[in-house]
């Protein structure tokens, strides 16, 4: 039977991609349905109880700048907050927080259940309704049919998921959850390229069986960082430390002597695992010269005894896992409460997607998260927000939107996936962005909130706070520019006490702030330049904008030069055999990838600068030289 009411957008899956997609589509006023096999696992952290990190924290800030959920949820659930790379430049500084799994899940569910235009329904999806190469609905396991103008797949590791512990394996979406086999079969019938990937998770340890007294502690930062531009540290729950132990030669001997029982090394697992989050058996074999590896013992929550040993993801048999755990300092008597495992699952080639993450072959069908070959909650959430936005726009007969590489890490992520594809789980790093000085955590709102407002993602409260911050930045910069001190002034001695070289000429507040030894905090304690802004976010922006003004201006020039051709559109129906002068290899690659723009085409391996020049000349001759807005 058909459900009596139609929807604008259906989201299939309630993980980090699905929840952001559902919230985004509903925020934009579209009638949205979130289908999940279990309402109690909405926002579940299937692996590491943490949000953020290098590159990942940048994505979380961007999701927040566009009105998303993840940053707000972790501010309510984070039990240890740190700034990584704090001693380095602002481009690579990143926020990371340990999470209480239960509090995080509660924060996500509360937000979903209080979001207007959003309905949540508990049923697994087994089929899609496709008519004339357009998706028009979904069918659940009990045969209930839902109609919609757009359908979003955010199914994580559930598509034909297979869990491995040693040489034993069984079907599962993750530990304790069933796989989605009928939907996997249905998707394989569609004209989509499919592959298999693998990820893994470590065993969980009973904290009561660990001797923490012999281990080093790792505390969070004070003052505590905040993820959301709308948040403050008073929202954080109780803060707790993590602990550090190490593997040793005994650990490594146990692993080496049991490799024949590893499904990875025995050839049982075919899927490729994440390069930057390898299993402990992989680390021991790949880095044979290392006699130890650092392991972080991370609490899973304030009311839980479970510890997540970050660094020993494994699919070795349970008896070997016990030996590995008990070989490490402080864990000689440790007990495992959940075994580690690896999971293989289907993913679909993201090169078959438009930059909006809509399928090139099935109109109205969108993909986000691990189904696109990514790994990580943050990567999933960012894609989820983008597909929710674009599914909503499609259902309202509006053009889709995707950020450029120069606008956001989300733009880098989507461009990498849609242009290059991936053969292993894709993780975001700051090194993937060529314009990372412009794409900092601290300015995510300055880059994206105005766009989010235009798209309908940003509410009145966030918009008012954003404009207040802009005004504070502008007012303070003008004040510092127009406040001067001379070498002969009474205040010169006070100023010179904070400088490595005394004043030799008149200097403004901005001139002084450009000096390496001067900070905004110091500057605004000096009589001529007091008081400091009470808006800490605005104060941070003032300091960064002044200190890095020259570098930022140079990078902006680079972006403008690159954008002249980057946004030149390529017709989706163009047969590149029509373009004389291109090599057969280039023609084959362009016809295979069908890039949306010159920028995308230039990043395809084997497409040379000469080929790009030929393309531009041909487009001009044909009167087809058009640039996107």
UniProtKB/Swiss-Prot annotation:
Keyword tRNA processing present in the record's keywords: the answer is yes
Matching entries from PROSITE patterns are given as:
GIDA_1 (PS01280)
**Per its Swiss-Prot or TrEMBL entry, what cofactor is needed?**
FAD
Q: What keywords would UniProt list here?
A: Cytoplasm, FAD, Flavoprotein, NAD, tRNA processing
Task: Report any one BP term from Gene Ontology.
Answer: tRNA methylation
Binding of NAD(+) occurs at 273-287
GO terms, molecular function: flavin adenine dinucleotide binding
Q: What is its main location?
A: cytoplasm
Cellular component aspect of the GO annotation: cytosol
Listed SUPFAM superfamilies: FAD/NAD(P)-binding domain
State if Cytoplasm is listed as a keyword.
yes
Write out the residues that bind FAD: 13-18, 125, 180, 370
Spell out the subcellular localization from the entry: Cytoplasm
Q: How does it assemble?
A: Homodimer. Heterotetramer of two MnmE and two MnmG subunits.
Q: What does this protein do?
A: NAD-binding protein involved in the addition of a carboxymethylaminomethyl (cmnm) group at the wobble position (U34) of certain tRNAs, forming tRNA-cmnm(5)s(2)U34.
Give the family this protein belongs to, as stated in its UniProt record. Answer: Belongs to the MnmG family.
- What protein name applies here? tRNA uridine 5-carboxymethylaminomethyl modification enzyme MnmG
Supply the source organism for this entry.
Shigella sonnei (strain Ss046)
Q: Which gene encodes it?
A: mnmG
């Amino acid at each position: 039977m058909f459900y009596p009411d139609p929807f604008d957008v259906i989201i299939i899956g309630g993980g980090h991609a699905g929840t952001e997609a559902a919230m985004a589509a509903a925020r934009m006023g579209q009638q949205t349905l979130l289908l999940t096999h279990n309402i109690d696992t909405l926002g579940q952290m299937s692996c590491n109880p943490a949000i953020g990190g290098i590159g990942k924290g940048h994505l979380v800030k961007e999701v927040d700048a566009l009105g998303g959920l993840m940053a707000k949820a972790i501010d309510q659930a984070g039990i240890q907050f740190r700034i990584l790379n704090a001693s380095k430049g602002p481009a690579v500084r990143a926020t990371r927080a340990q999470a209480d799994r239960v509090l995080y899940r509660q924060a996500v569910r509360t937000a979903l259940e209080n979001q207007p235009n959003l309905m949540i329904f508990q049923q697994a999806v087994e089929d899609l309704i496709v008519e004339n190469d357009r998706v028009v609905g979904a069918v659940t396991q009990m045969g209930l049919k839902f109609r919609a103008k757009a359908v979003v797949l955010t199914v994580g590791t559930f598509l034909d998921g297979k869990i491995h512990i040693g040489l034993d394996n069984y079907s599962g979406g993750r530990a304790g959850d069933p796989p989605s086999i009928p939907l996997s079969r249905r998707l394989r019938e569609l004209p989509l390229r499919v592959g298999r990937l693998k990820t893994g998770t470590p065993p969980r340890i009973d904290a009561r069986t660990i001797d923490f007294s012999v281990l080093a502690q790792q505390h969070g930062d004070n003052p505590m960082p905040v993820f959301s531009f709308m948040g403050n540290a008073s929202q954080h729950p109780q803060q707790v430390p993590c602990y550090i132990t190490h593997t040793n030669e005994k650990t490594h001997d146990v692993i080496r002597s049991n490799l024949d029982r590893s499904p990875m090394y025995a050839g049982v697992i075919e899927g490729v695992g994440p390069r930057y989050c390898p299993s402990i058996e992989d680390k021991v074999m790949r880095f044979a010269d290392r006699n130890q590896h650092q392991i972080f013992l991370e609490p899973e929550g304030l009311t839980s005894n479970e510890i997540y040993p970050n660094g020993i993801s494994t699919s070795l048999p349970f008896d070997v896992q016990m030996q590995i755990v008990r070989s490490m300092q402080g864990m000689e008597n440790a007990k495992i409460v959940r075994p580690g495992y690896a999971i293989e699952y289907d993913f679909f080639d993201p090169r078959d997607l438009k930059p909006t993450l809509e399928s090139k072959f099935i109109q109205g069908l969108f993909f986000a998260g691990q189904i696109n070959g990514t790994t990580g909650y943050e990567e999933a959430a960012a894609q989820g927000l983008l597909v929710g936005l674009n599914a909503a726009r499609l259902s309202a007969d509006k053009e889709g939107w995707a950020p450029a590489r120069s606008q956001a890490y989300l733009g880098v992520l989507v461009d990498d996936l849609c242009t290059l594809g991936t053969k292993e789980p894709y993780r975001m790093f700051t090194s993937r962005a060529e314009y990372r000085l412009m794409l900092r955590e601290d300015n995510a709102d300055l880059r994206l909130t105005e766009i989010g407002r235009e798209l309908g993602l940003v509410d009145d409260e966030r918009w008012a706070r954003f404009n207040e911050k802009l005004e504070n930045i502008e007012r303070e910069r003008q004040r510092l520019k127009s406040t001067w001190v001379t070498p002969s002034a009474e205040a010169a001695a006070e100023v010179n006490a904070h400088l490595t070289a005394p004043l030799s000429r008149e200097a403004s507040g901005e001139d002084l702030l450009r000096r390496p030894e001067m900070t905004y905090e110091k500057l605004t304690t000096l009589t001529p330049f007091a008081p400091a802004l009470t808006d800490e976010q605005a104060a941070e922006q003032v300091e960064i904008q002044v200190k890095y003004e020259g570098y930022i201006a140079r990078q902006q020039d680079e972006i403008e030069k690159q954008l002249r051709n980057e946004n030149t559109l390529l017709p989706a129906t163009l047969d590149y055999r029509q373009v004389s002068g291109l090599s057969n290899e280039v023609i084959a690659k362009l016809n295979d990838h069908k890039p949306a723009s010159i920028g995308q085409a230039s990043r395809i391996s084997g497409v040379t600068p000469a080929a790009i020049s030929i393309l531009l000349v041909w487009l001009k001759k044909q009167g087809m030289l058009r640039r996107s807005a």
